[in-house]
């Protein structure tokens, strides 16, 4: 049973690592895929267009300074990169534990650091997005952030419960 649990933990952690690797790679190499949308959320552009009365109550929250918007985007990318590295370290450690070249407790701890960082990235997006009321006009992004948060939590539970 211990081997099956380790395999499940390994696959779940590696899946998070692989998924986030693609995202962070694109954010580094092709920032135009996401950065303008981050700026749009921070400036509350769509909310102002689609829900002007609601926007009037929270318009003071908008950040339109492009330097601040870009800086925020690259802070997020840095956090994604950190989470990706931690996830791959956890994945490698779990693989090593599976083959007896690392302790299971250490491997699970390292994987848990990665899943915690992954979850923090996406829950952070939910929190910041909430500040900018992004549910008014960016439901798809909010849904993705919820799904990623839940995926991270689920993987963390698998690691802890399987200990």
Language-model features: where?
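Short, charged low-complexity intrinsically disordered segments located at boundaries
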Residues: 54, 70-72, 154
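Individual transmembrane alpha-helix segments
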Residues: 61-83
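Generic secondary-structure microfeatures
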Residues: 42, 79, 83, 89-90
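Extended, low-polarity transmembrane helix blocks
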Residues: 2-26, 74, 85-163
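Long, hydrophobic N-terminal alpha-helical segment
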Residues: 1-67
């Amino acid at each position: 049973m211990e081997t099956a649990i380790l395999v499940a933990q390994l696959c779940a952690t590696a899946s998070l690592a692989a998924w986030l690797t693609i995202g962070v790679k694109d954010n580094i190499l092709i920032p135009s895929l996401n950065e303008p949308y981050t700026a749009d959320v921070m400036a509350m552009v769509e909310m102002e267009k689609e829900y002007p009365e609601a926007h009037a109550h929270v318009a003071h929250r908008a950040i339109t300074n492009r330097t601040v918007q870009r800086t925020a985007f690259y802070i997020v990318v840095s956090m994604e990169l950190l989470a990706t590295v931690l996830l791959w370290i956890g994945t490698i450690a779990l693989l090593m534990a599976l083959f007896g070249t690392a302790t299971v407790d250490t491997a699970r701890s390292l994987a848990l650091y990665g899943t915690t960082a992954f979850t923090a990235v996406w829950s952070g997006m939910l929190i910041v997005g909430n500040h900018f009321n992004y549910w008014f006009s960016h439901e798809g992004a909010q849904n993705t952030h919820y799904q990623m948060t839940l995926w991270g939590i689920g993987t963390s539970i698998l690691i802890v419960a399987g200990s």
